[in-house]
């Protein structure tokens, strides 16, 4: 159950906005109440009902929409320097409240982190930006007579990064596996702005499996920026 009485850190929202506007375009930083209200809900049935009733328990203080990895790095530095909670969010199709800013703070909208996918036929993998919509990637592959063979119910309403963050499954998962099987590896940015890559290499018997460490962590440890997935003919 979500705790609605979590104590928030002390910071001045105006100062945070000013700092963020030095990192991203001013229009990418939003504090208008009606927009914040939209970001205080996802597809969780309780949240959907509260939205209809005009109840906004989990309104963030600011929403920022980066368009590059460089901007994400700058945003996370602002958040760390000012002790502002950060909630990474894709398209908000979660049905259990994962993308709600329960401590207020900042929502990091990753839906605009999208670039042309990179296909490797030799490896039968595709690398895509975390903000890319699942159905867009599948359509892009279909034009090349390829498929992910990964079909969560929210395919058209969720992002690639969201799949990793929530350890998603879907139709055909009984045959081809969940995202833990479909994702070969991914790129991440830690809260201290360290960039790391996990997976994407041949099987090894030395050291821990860092890929498993980040699957399903819902942004607690890092922000996902790119995901490499298996493709099939």
Q: For each predicted feature, which ranges?
A:
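N-terminal flexible segment immediately upstream of the FAD-binding catalytic core
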Residues: 1-77, 93-124
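Residues at alpha-helix termini
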Residues: 22-23, 81, 143, 217
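Acidic/histidine-enriched ion/cofactor-binding microenvironments in catalytic or ligand-binding pockets
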Residues: 77-78, 180
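A generic structural signal for well-ordered alpha-helical segments
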Residues: 79, 86-88, 141
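Residue-level detector of anion-binding/catalytic polar loops
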Residues: 84-85, 147
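Extended, hydrophobic alpha-helical segments in both membrane/secreted and soluble proteins
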Residues: 86, 95-97, 137
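Short, glycine-/polar-rich solvent-exposed loops and beta-turns at beta-strand/coil boundaries
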Residues: 90-91, 153
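FAD-binding subdomain of flavoenzyme oxidoreductases
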Residues: 115-233
């Amino acid at each position: 159950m979500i705790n609605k009485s979590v104590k928030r850190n002390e910071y001045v929202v105006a100062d945070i906005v000013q700092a963020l506007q030095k990192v991203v375009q001013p229009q990418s930083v939003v504090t208008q109440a009606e927009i914040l209200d939209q970001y205080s809900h996802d597809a969780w049935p309780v949240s959907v009902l509260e939205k209809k009733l005009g109840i906004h328990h989990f309104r963030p203080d600011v929403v920022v929409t980066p368009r590059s990895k460089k901007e994400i790095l700058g945003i996370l530095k602002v958040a760390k320097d000012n002790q502002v909670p950060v909630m990474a969010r894709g398209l908000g199709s979660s049905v259990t409240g994962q993308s709600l800013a329960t401590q207020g703070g900042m929502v990091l909208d990753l839906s605009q982190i999208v670039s042309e996918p990179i296909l490797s036929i030799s490896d039968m993998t595709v690398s895509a930006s975390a903000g890319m919509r699942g159905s867009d990637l599948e359509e892009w592959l279909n034009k090349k007579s390829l498929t992910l063979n990964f079909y969560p119910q929210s395919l058209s309403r969720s992002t690639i990064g969201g799949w990793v963050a929530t350890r998603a499954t879907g139709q055909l998962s009984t045959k081809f596996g969940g995202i833990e099987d479909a994702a070969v590896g991914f790129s991440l940015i830690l809260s201290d702005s360290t960039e790391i890559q996990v997976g994407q290499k041949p099987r090894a018997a030395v050291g821990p499996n860092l890929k498993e460490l980040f699957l399903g962590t819902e942004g607690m440890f890092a922000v996902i920026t790119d995901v490499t997935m298996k493709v099939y003919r």
